[in-house]
UniProtKB/Swiss-Prot annotation:
Signal peptide coordinates: 1-22
Function: Plays a role in broad-spectrum disease resistance. Probably has no oxalate oxidase activity even if the active site is conserved.
PROSITE patterns: GERMIN
Miscellaneous comment: Member of the 12 germin-like protein gene cluster located on chromosome 8 in the major-effect quantitative trait loci (QTL) for fungal blast resistance. Partial suppression of the 12 germin-like protein genes increases susceptibility to the fungal pathogens causing rice blast and sheath blight diseases.
All copies of domain Cupin type-1, residue ranges: 62-212
Disulphide connectivity of cysteines: 32-47
Protein's UniProt name: Germin-like protein 8-5
Length: 224
């Protein structure tokens, strides 16, 4: 029969192994440039042959200093992730420029795979995130040029330009090569196929006609 100390050691090893498997692995080589054409399906991308790698795999002429035209909610997101720079594969980071029209917003959304840190380059932004159930606490702040704010991974967050006359610009860094995004309104009212209006009417405590009207709108994909 195993001794108590042996059982404790086995339990500790099992816990350590479980924690190791539950987090993203660190790179095991200098780089693993994504091979976009590989038939191998892995969590991320297979590595391109290092002998075929060149500097362009780590470069993108993105012109992130150039203003972008905003959409009907008054924002435009220019994302640079592993799909634009294959060299980001396994490195756990991406970047985005967000342009905001006067009174424009980046609507409430989440990044299921990344924490975000946002820096205001120009203008003013009202930003915030909401904690999970049951408290649903709002943490919000008005940011000015040079200010920085963090949005924890997976939590609903937003940015809004309160200035009716001046645009705003921000840069966001995200802790994933592919952070993903779920824009709340798009997901709930613009899903394909649509969620039953009976389900949504009860969830939001409104008439079915209100839900039908919302689902009939054009839910533009503006996310990163």
């Amino acid at each position: 029969m195993a001794s108590p100390s042996s059982l404790c050691l086995l339990a500790a090893l099992a816990l350590i192994s479980w924690q190791a498997m539950a987090s993203d692995p660190s790179p095991l080589q200098d780089f693993c440039v994504a091979d976009m054409h590989s038939p191998v399906r892995v969590n991320g991308f297979a590595c391109l042959n290092p002998m075929e790698v060149n500097a362009d795999h780590f470069f993108k002429a993105a012109k992130l200093d150039t203003p972008r035209k905003t959409n009907k909610v008054g924002s435009n997101v220019t994302l640079i992730n592993v799909m634009q720079i294959p060299g980001l594969n396994t490195l756990g980071i991406s970047i985005a420029r967000i342009d905001y029209a006067p009174l424009g917003q980046n609507p409430p959304h989440t990044h299921p795979r990344a924490t975000e840190i946002l820096t205001v380059l120009e203008g003013t932004l009202y930003v915030g995130f909401v904690t999970s159930n049951p408290n649903n606490t709002l943490f919000s702040k008005v940011l000015n040029k040079g200010d920085v704010f963090v949005f924890p991974q997976g939590l609903i967050h937003f940015q809004f330009n309160p200035n009716p006359h001046q645009p705003a610009v921000a840069i966001a860094a995200l802790s994933s090569q592919n952070p993903g995004a779920i824009t709340i309104a798009n997901a709930v009212f613009g899903s394909k196929p649509p969620i039953s209006d009976e389900v949504l009417a009860k969830a939001f405590q409104v008439e079915k006609g209100t839900i039908d009207w919302l689902q009939a709108q054009f839910w533009e994909n503006n996310h990163y």
